[in-house]
Amino acid sequence: MSAPDKQQPPHGGGTGGGGGAGGQAMDPAAAGPTKAKKTNAGVRRPEKPPYSYIALIVMAIQSSPSKRLTLSEIYQFLQARFPFFRGAYQGWKNSVRHNLSLNECFIKLPKGLGRPGKGHYWTIDPASEFMFEEGSFRRRPRGFRRKCQALKPVYSMVNGLGFNHLPDTYGFQGSGGLSCAPNSLALEGGLGMMNGHLAGNVDGMALPSHSVPHLPSNGGHSYMGGCGGSAAGEYPHHDSSVPASPLLPAGAGGVMEPHAVYSSSAAAWPPAASAALNSGASYIKQQPLSPCNPAANPLSGSISTHSLEQPYLHQNSHNGPAELQGIPRYHSQSPSMCDRKEFVFSFNAMASSSMHTTGGGSYYHQQVTYQDIKPCVM
């Protein structure tokens, strides 16, 4: 009995001791991770800079003397400048790459042929530099990019009135050495060009019973302000009522829109032509005209017109067009002038208030939706 009694305490003690030893061995192991977690939880990452990634990239690129950096150089600049990018967190590198490739304010320059490595240089688009003037690198509010796009200069032409951007092919020349560069077309506030060109066009078509009232000019507008040559002789201005074309019926003031016919001659029409034009036709389509060959066309010597578009003359005459057989439908012109483009300006909105006159009847209307250049037919 004594042997088992003697054996039990060591067994129990051994078991208890083993349990105690096991408990003492597990306690430090269990306490170790807990202390480590507490230590990591107490350490905070540095605060993120109060700038957007676009601004951070711009800072890095502008710090370079050459105003261009590779992706790795941008990384190095950010890590040296801000402690936030020095830790174990590497997700900011993806953000830098995405902002470089997705924003149009950054341009990837082509790599030189002799430069080793795979990195491309990145620079700032010159058109976007105004966004970062005076060091404005703070975070932008939502919608800032759209506002910046709206603030960019707008060079689009409104109603076709951009005279400074007309190509040289639109430089137009008269028959008497009159030449106008596109930049010399002066827009002085009115439509006085109608007074001279209309009067010069209908000066030779004299009928006592027809007259056209003097069209008002706001501020003496003239298209020949910057031109050199004998403009006064070929484009006279009349202050009184002038004889009108028989194509415009008597008493019909009408609406004449400013795509007028340029006349380079004020000579009288032949009597036969003026007599044949007394009746007129319902619709006479005028093509873009130019100085023609006098030998091929008897009317070209006295009436040399340069129409801006294809106007339609609406008539109220009831006579047939048989008397117009002697007048060619299309005035031919030399091949060198046929290739010239037409002068097309949209002054409808500007001329609506100053060009309307009282009276009814016929009107002078032009088609602005299309234009075609007919081939030269001699």
UniProtKB/Swiss-Prot annotation:
MF GO annotations: DNA-binding transcription activator activity, RNA polymerase II-specific; RNA polymerase II cis-regulatory region sequence-specific DNA binding; transcription cis-regulatory region binding
DNA-binding region(s), residue ranges: 47-138
Presence of keyword ATP-binding: no
Domain of life where this protein originates: Eukaryota
Region (Disordered): 1-45
SMART domains with a match to the protein in the record: FH
UniProtKB keywords: Activator, DNA-binding, Nucleus, Transcription, Transcription regulation
Residue ranges with Gly residues bias: 11-23
Biological process according to GO: animal organ morphogenesis; cardiac left ventricle morphogenesis; cell-cell adhesion; cellular response to cytokine stimulus; detection of wounding; determination of left/right symmetry; ductus arteriosus closure; embryonic digestive tract development
InterPro entries: Fork_head_dom (IPR001766), Forkhead_box_regulator (IPR051770), TF_fork_head_CS_1 (IPR018122), TF_fork_head_CS_2 (IPR030456), WH-like_DNA-bd_sf (IPR036388), WH_DNA-bd_sf (IPR036390)
Compositional bias segments (type: Low complexity): 24-42
GO cellular component entries: nucleoplasm; nucleus
Main location: nucleus
Expressing tissues: Expressed primarily in lung in alveolar type II pneumocyte cells, and to a lesser extent in placenta, stomach, intestine and colon.
Subcellular location: Nucleus
The protein's role, per its UniProt record: Probable transcription activator for a number of lung-specific genes.
UniProt free text on domains: Activation domains C-terminal of (and distinct from) the forkhead domains are necessary for transcriptional activation.
UniProt-recorded name of the protein: Forkhead box protein F1
Biological source species: Mus musculus
Gene label: Foxf1
